């Protein structure tokens, strides 16, 4: 039975109560204080102090200061009046019990409201952070699009200027071609109109219509305006170099590696963007790779809930990409959703088949994350199995080796305790 304390001192003003309670040599760390509107309790074993207040107080503003083997309470009254006494007179056991229960229920409700308010504030902060990040990305995308548009306009204007120069040059060439035949014809006419001498019989002159000048002038124009004949058709043979994996020939897994490449190609084609629920999304938001990169950025900023949302949407668009499940498992580990982390790691391992060198790192991470989730659930044997599977993939990984050794020590220590 605790020893009830009745030694204390108090003073009051119309708005405040000042209460001093000695701790009687008890360590300050062992003192437990509970304060409600009508009830005050201090438990400092083996002593117990209870006070059923005369009138309600504002327990949210009231304060307690512990020091020098004394607790100093500053209690703020709800109504600024002087009290006749500090505690309610004539309180029986039933009334005390009712006041205790009522105070405890009020404290629980306030704690619940505070927790809910904190959760709402946290969600609002996360939503605000996600909105700000999306706004920044939208501004960057718009800036890039503006740069592209400016470059396109610049290239278009340069092309138009070049076309205009070409038109002017072609016009000048056509004018020069027209002037050359006229000059030749004028020269022939001038020669034909020269005066002839009387004593000498002039030879008969020929008209320049079908003479040598005809053959010299118009064939040049025809040669210049002649269009070359079209080229003969042909065919070009194209062959692609085969993809070669960096694997020794004695350890080669050509069939498995080809199967893995085939599965990767099928996974890239397995898109579900034609569903009605995705019509409102932007073009980049329908791209699983873009969503995966966005989830990675959110994970790096420790916004794990938003990262899970990004991976969820990417998986709904394409459920055949193993890295989406692997990254979402890492988020669930951070959020302590251990069973979901195990499910996502198992799904990633299911998609990372057949086992080849190209997916070895991803398989190792999947085993480690599933083993970590098992260990946090205190299923150390299952966790050790996953860590050993990871070591088979990457035997030189010292971090995984150290973690596996710690798990073995835990299992051996548990076995020794059970024997004792």
UniProtKB/Swiss-Prot annotation:
GO terms for molecular function: nuclear estrogen receptor binding. Residues 164-212 are annotated as: Disordered. Residues 7-103 are annotated as: Mediates interaction with ESR1 and STUB1. InterPro entries: CS_dom, CS_DYX1C1, Dynein_assembly_factor_4, HSP20-like_chaperone, TPR-like_helical_dom_sf, TPR_rpt. It is found in: Nucleus; Cytoplasm; Dynein axonemal particle; Cell projection, Neuron projection. CDD domains: p23_DYX1C1_like (cd06469). GO terms for biological process: cilium movement; determination of left/right symmetry; epithelial cilium movement involved in extracellular fluid movement; establishment of localization in cell; heart development; inner dynein arm assembly; learning or memory; neuron migration. GO terms for cellular component: centrosome; cytoplasm; cytosol; dynein axonemal particle; extracellular region; neuron projection; non-motile cilium; nucleus. Coiled coil: none annotated. Keywords: Cell projection, Cytoplasm, Neurogenesis, Nucleus, Repeat, TPR repeat. Residues 164-192 have a biased composition (Basic and acidic residues). Residues 3-87 form the CS domain. TPR repeats lie at residues 288-321, 322-355, 364-397. Interacts with ZMYND10. Interacts with ESR1 and ESR2. Interacts with STUB1. Interacts with DNAAF2. Interacts with CCT3, CCT4, CCT5 and CCT8. Interacts with DNAAF6/PIH1D3. Involved in neuronal migration during development of the cerebral neocortex. May regulate the stability and proteasomal degradation of the estrogen receptors that play an important role in neuronal differentiation, survival and plasticity. Axonemal dynein assembly factor required for ciliary motility. This is Dynein axonemal assembly factor 4. It comes from Mus musculus.
């Amino acid at each position: 039975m605790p020893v009830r304390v009745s030694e204390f001192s108090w003073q009051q003003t119309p708005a405040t109560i000042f209460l001093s309670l000695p701790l009687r040599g008890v360590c300050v760390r062992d003192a437990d204080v509970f304060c409600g509107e009508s009830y005050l309790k201090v438990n400092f074993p083996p002593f117990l102090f209870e006070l059923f207040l005369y009138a309600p107080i504002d327990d949210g503003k009231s304060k307690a200061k512990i020091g020098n083997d004394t607790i100093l309470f500053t209690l703020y009254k709800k109504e600024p009046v002087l009290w006749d006494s500090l505690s309610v007179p004539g309180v029986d056991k039933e009334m005390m019990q009712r006041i205790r229960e009522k105070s405890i229920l009020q404290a629980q409700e306030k704690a619940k409201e505070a927790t809910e308010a904190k959760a709402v504030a946290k969600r609002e902060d996360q939503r605000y952070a996600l909105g700000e990040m999306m706004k920044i990305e939208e501004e960057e995308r718009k800036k890039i699009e503006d740069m592209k548009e400016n470059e396109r306009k610049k290239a278009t204007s340069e092309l138009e200027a070049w076309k205009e120069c070409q038109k002017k040059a072609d016009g000048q060439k056509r004018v020069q071609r027209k002037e050359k035949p006229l000059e030749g014809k004028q020269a022939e006419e001038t020669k034909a109109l020269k005066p002839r001498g009387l004593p000498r019989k002039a030879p008969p002159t020929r008209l320049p219509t079908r003479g040598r000048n005809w053959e010299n002038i118009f064939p040049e124009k025809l040669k210049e305006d002649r269009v070359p004949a079209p080229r003969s058709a042909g065919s070009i043979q194209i062959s692609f170099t085969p993809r070669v994996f960096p694997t020794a020939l004695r350890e080669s897994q050509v069939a498995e590696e080809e199967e893995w490449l085939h599965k990767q190609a099928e996974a890239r084609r397995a898109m579900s963007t034609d569903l009605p629920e995705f019509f409102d999304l932007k073009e980049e938001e329908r791209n699983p790779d873009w969503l995966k990169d966005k989830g990675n950025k959110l994970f790096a900023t420790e916004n794990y809930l938003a990262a899970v949302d990004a991976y969820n949407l990417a998986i709904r668009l394409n459920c055949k990409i193993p890295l989406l499940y692997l990254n979402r498992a890492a988020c669930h580990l951070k959020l302590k959703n251990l069973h979901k982390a195990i499910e996502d790691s198992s799904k990633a391992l299911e998609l990372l088949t057949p086992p080849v060198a190209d997916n070895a790192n991803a398989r190792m991470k999947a085993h480690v994350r599933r083993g970590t989730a098992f260990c946090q659930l205190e299923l150390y044997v299952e966790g050790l199995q996953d860590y050993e599977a990871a070591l088979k993939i990457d035997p030189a990984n010292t971090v995984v080796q150290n973690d596996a050794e710690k798990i073995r020590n835990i299992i051996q220590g548990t076995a020794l305790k059970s024997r004792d």
